[in-house]
Amino acid sequence: MLNEKKMRVKVDLHVHTVYSPDSSITLEQLVFWAKKRGLTGVAITDHDSVEGALKFARETDFLIIPGTEVNSRDGHVVALNVREVIPKGLSAEETVERIHVVGGVAVACHPFALFKGSLGRHASSKFDAVETINASASPFKRSLRKAEAIAARFKLPRVAGTDAHYAPAIGLAYTVVAAEPNVDAVVKAIANGRCQPFGESVPLRLKLAKYFHYFK
């Protein structure tokens, strides 16, 4: 939680780009919509890849937290502040260990959302944080409620992200972090619980627009 008078940043901690096969978001779109929504930064979390995150971070002064969404055999895991691919197909626990080995932070993302490769009972105290608000999760309120319960059970920090695959969704969920606006400070503050999630569900019209764009 936020209870200190320090600099605060506003970051969407779960965004996909054109380096994910199911996303259409370019660097220009990402920066435009992030700034439009008043964000300080964005975590790029492409599926089993860090290529886009590293490339985009080199090409803009906007705060980009390099990450990836790892397809573990137990469900999806978001790794923040990693600069190499985490092998997919490992158990959730092994995935978290690999993330820690390379200095990253492991987030149990959308742990109870339907149709998203969610962790469910595999979310554990091994994680550094729980994504309690995922703007793309369905059913939204049920997912939020169950994720909150897991975070409380394991006494883990709570974060939020949109899981955006279509640019106008960026920033509909975000995390406010008590930290200086740089990658290491933000990620360290998240791991230490100096953060608070906010957000809403992606409107149906944006979800439909995403699929129209993808299949056209």
Label the model's feature ranges.
Residues 1-17, 21, 27-32, 51-55, ...:
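Charged catalytic cores and adjacent phosphate/nucleic-acid-binding surfaces used
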Residues 30-48, 105-107:
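Divalent metal-dependent hydrolysis catalytic cores, especially in the metallo-beta-lactamase
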